[in-house]
Amino acid sequence: MSTKTIKIYVFKRFERFWHWAQAGLIVFMMLTGFEIHGAYAFFGFEKAVGYHTVAAWSLITLWVFAIFWHFTTGEWKQYIPTLEKVGAMMRYYLTGIFTNAPHPFRQTTLRKHNPLQRLAYLFFLLVISPVIWFSGWFYLFYGAWREWGVDKYLSLEWVAFFHTAGAFMVLIFFIAHIYLATAGHTPTSHIKAMLTGWEEVEEEESAATK
Amino acid sequence: MRKLFATVALLAAQALPCAWAATDPAPAPGPAPAAKPASKSTADHTKFKELQQAFKSGPEVTKACLACHTEAGKQITHTKHWTWEWMNPENKQVLGKKHVVNNFCTAVPSNYEFCTACHVGYGWKDANFDFKNETNVDCLVCHDTTGGYKKLPGLAGHPAYKEMEFPPKSGKMVKPADLAKVAQNVGPTSRATCGACHFLGGGGDAVKHGDLDTSLKNPGKYLDVHMDAKGLNFTCAACHATQGHNIPGSRYTPTAADKEAAHMRGKKDDTNAATCQSCHGQKPHKATGVRAKLNEHTDKLACQTCHIPQYARAQPTKMSWDWSTAGKLKDGKPFTVKDSGGHDAYDSKKGDFRYESHVIPEYVWLNGKVKYTLLGDPVNENGVTKINEFFGSPDDGASRIWPVKVFRGKQPYDLESKSLLVPHTAAGYGVRDDTAFWQNFQWEGALQAGAEAAGRPFGGKFGFVATEMTWPITHMVAPKEDALTCTQCHSKSGRLQNVKGIYLPGRDANPWLDLLGGLAALGTLLGVIAHGALRIYMNRKAG
Amino acid sequence: MLKFIGGVAAGVVLTGALGYGMADKLMFNETMSPFGVEETVARIQHNIQAAGNGWTLSGLRNPARAVQADGGNTLPVMMVEACSTKYSKPILNEDSVRFLSILMPCKISVYKKNDGKVYIGTMNAGLMGKMFGPLVGEVMGQVAADQKKFLEMDPKKPAPPMIVPKAGGEGGGSGGGGGSNC
């Protein structure tokens, strides 16, 4: 395997702040959300609802900033899906990773996510997020349904169903995400990158793309 | 501080033979009893010539009252308090005390002289009572302020006019009412005057309602935040705002969901003035943040559901009554058995009872429609007969979840007609009556006499059927700090565990989604653990 | 070696944590009563009076009353207090454990919970006694055995009347209750 590595700057300061703030909020919302769902008692229902709501508004605020940031910096392009090398990535996770085969994807500042990541994040953005945000929005504004004229079409049971379904998807995403964070060049390289912004990558290839 | 701990409640309330109308003095309004507080009334009845006479009877007093209050008699004679009869316009059922059967003392018709101690009139001793005669109206029972006016069961609505032994053969003497004094001291109704009947319904203190008993004459804040004698000190009429002697708020047609704004002076509003919303409006919770969510509960919950966490918080209320065991005698004599708290557990006259305090209500959907099982209506021999059925559903937009007291019992029914029977229980004062159950303890004669008085057939064979009577809980509103907490409903085995038709977060979940989602998450977790373990293993092998 | 020590340390920490978490369940006991609050109290009171070994009732507290007097609500709770000089005397006579007088008199709490059911709360006198040496351990062991008898209730027997101490009794509600104060 390559003996030399170099460091490249992948995640900018706002991006890192966004990631960790979002991570904290999502974990906290899962914790409070599943309590509201009745899975366990920790904060108590009333506090759990209160915290969950505050966290939701915080996350919305964070997203407003993040969306603004993505569009002004052009970083949104990082999520454009590609099927190129998807097969190679899957083969890598299924076999190559065990034999220390070289990572098929060369990370650069302009292409910081591997093709599977792109697909996964796009899935999060286009499927999980709408499910959880729309259902959550109606859940939160249950009292305004009549005013909005939607009380005839909605039932709390189904709103809660989709919100819970979204929550399970987030939970699954979260488990896989944490694990795959250890599947970089070294087990900690992705995590370090998310903390410091600097990712270790193999030398010659990254040098070439630079 | 010691005093707070000093006594354990000596639960002294004694069940009376049957509702015993007795008024106690209204709580003294101020700390200085020496000087009479300035009255806001424009009339001092002690100065009225009409009232300065030696009244010999109640009707004589009424005649004097009506001399000035010319329309009062007419007004009263149109009320349920007078007619004991009322037709439900919804389903045309004829209700009222004269007609309904309950599972307490069951029914009035054969027992007029006794039961009419709680009639706002004089002389109703049989079916021939003259409902047109306004001088038969009893003004004093509601307007007494002295506490010296008592109507005794057995006297057909009259108070004692001479000293008499009461209850008969008890050795206790009751002094006659000083009618002139009572008449000269009339005033607005009070918790004591309304309570003289309504606190003692069903045969004694705290028997019937559970949320109305004599502890409300002088309640602490804990018991009722509005009637708190040292605080807001509401009278009954503060909420049951009465006009022309017509009192709003009746459980025959409860206002299950008041969707009106708070009543405002000058604005025409014919809706029930006795609801919570009539003062508190539709968004009663002023809080911000998560507590603001409370206002969003008003589309499904009655206010009472959260704000009356338990009823009978000052003294126990009767929860069940089994007539089928009544009539047992010891050495040929009736007897009573007390429970550990000193309340009747058995009475030869009535059967077995169970009392309970701090009762957690049951909860039901109620849209205000109620149907009674009246005499002649079929009973459910193998199950439970509902004396009054509360209707409601989560989807009709008119229902709210209400706290109720469900009073359970067993009472006689006719094996032939399969409908309820009513025993003749009590006779007039001092009357020897062989068919009265409370004198002879014989069912056949009592049921025959009861059926005759009610104009019903009786086949001669009877059994006992299980019955349930439902009472909306609406009094004894606790301070807001003691309202239910969220978790008390939003949990798997909470207060509303048996209420169907709503999705209640924390209680409900789609089991398939939970199973599928849970398995998927677990699968993912196991998958990444296996994947990681394999990586570590392969790495070691290679390294 | 390091792993072994680490393992032992982890085991100790885990046991400690488990013990800490379960201490309340070990030190105190909660059982459901088939009867109402008053009847449960009454049956316990009569069991105490019939238990022998010098047991007398020393009071009946109702802390819910104080909450009510303050304008608030709590579900019914009553504390039956009992005392036996046979057991209190040896402990009170031993200077090193005299502080245990704070556990006197012996208390049994009867209360209703939000599920509408009635529960009986007791202290695990046997286990607690063991923490204070052989003298206390033996006495408390006997107390625990007697306490078990206090809670035996035969539904076939009729409900006895609750024994209510006279109002204004000495000791703030822990008045006579039919027995001597000890």
Name every feature range the model reports, one short phrase each.
Chain B
Residues M1-L4:
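Positively charged n-region of N-terminal signal peptides that target proteins for export
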Residues T7-A15:
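Bacterial N-terminal signal peptides
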Residues A21-N133, L140-S190, A196-A273, Q277-N295, ...:
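Sequence context of c-type cytochrome heme-c attachment sites
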Residues T42-K47, Q53, P59, Q310-G543:
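Long, charged, low-complexity terminal extensions
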Residues D299:
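Active-site-proximal binding-pocket segments
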Residues A302-T305, P309-Q310:
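A conserved active-site cap/scaffold subdomain adjacent to cofactor or substrate pockets
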